[in-house]
UniProtKB/Swiss-Prot annotation:
It comes from Picea sitchensis (Sitka spruce). Homodimer and heterodimers. This is CASP-like protein 2A2. InterPro entries: CASP/CASPL (IPR006459), CASP_dom (IPR006702). PANTHER family: CASP-LIKE PROTEIN 2A1 (PTHR33573:SF46), CASP-LIKE PROTEIN 4A4 (PTHR33573). Belongs to the Casparian strip membrane proteins (CASP) family. It is found in: Cell membrane. The lineage of its organism: Eukaryota, Viridiplantae, Streptophyta, Embryophyta, Tracheophyta.
Length: 196
């Protein structure tokens, strides 16, 4: 069974204030702020996605998938901002705090993935239509609406990549606190012969 390593405080590692721990904390803070701009840009573009003519008025709020992506971008921007402020604080990363950050990063990543996937599918149908379901493509007539929604989806996927990398970072931070499991019998034999 894996045992937790003794955690070393980031403050203790910093020493004089210069070192790899401080640089890593600054990098993580900046990297957690990057999705804020991306998510807000995607959110604003989605909110501005509207077009009307004499037959129909299209708005992002008419399409559940686009509303879902707008909510996901808002939630993820807020989380990213809060987690960036949290990463600025020089405190030790205890196992419980690392688990919470890991699980939240995973949840936010999956939220962005789900919102982006659903919006991409709806956008695909809007561009191509679906003959079997007799759904006509609408982007030929409502190009401005589709272009803004499409740009929002693309920016959301860039934010998703940032959240994926943050998930990897938090996973590394969490699981590096544990000893590796005993592999096969080689390590067990070494321990047995050392006791003899």
């Amino acid at each position: 069974m894996a045992q937790g390593k003794e955690s070393v405080s980031v403050v203790e590692m910093e020493g004089s204030g210069n070192g790899p721990a401080v640089e890593m904390r600054h990098f993580e803070t900046l990297f957690r702020l990057l999705p804020v701009g991306l998510c807000i840009s995607a959110l604003v573009l989605m909110l501005k996605s509207e077009q009307s003519d004499q037959y129909m008025q299209l708005d992002y709020s008419n399409v559940d998938a686009f509303r879902c992506l707008a909510y996901a971008n808002g939630i993820c921007a807020g989380y990213s901002l809060i987690s960036a402020f949290d990463s600025m604080v020089p405190v030790s990363h205890h196992i419980s705090r690392s688990w919470i950050l890991f699980l939240l990063d995973q949840g936010i990543t999956y939220l962005m993935l789900a919102g982006g996937a659903v919006a991409t599918q709806v956008l695909y149908v809007a561009y191509k239509g679906d003959e079997k379901a007799t759904w006509e493509q609408i982007c030929g007539s409502y190009g401005r609406f589709c272009n803004r929604a499409g740009a929002s989806v693309i920016i959301s996927f860039f934010a998703l990549v940032c959240f994926l990398l943050l998930s990897l970072l938090s996973a590394y931070r969490l699981f590096s606190k544990y000893d590796p499991p005993i592999h096969g019998g080689a390590k067990l034999e070494d321990q047995t012969t050392a006791q003899i």
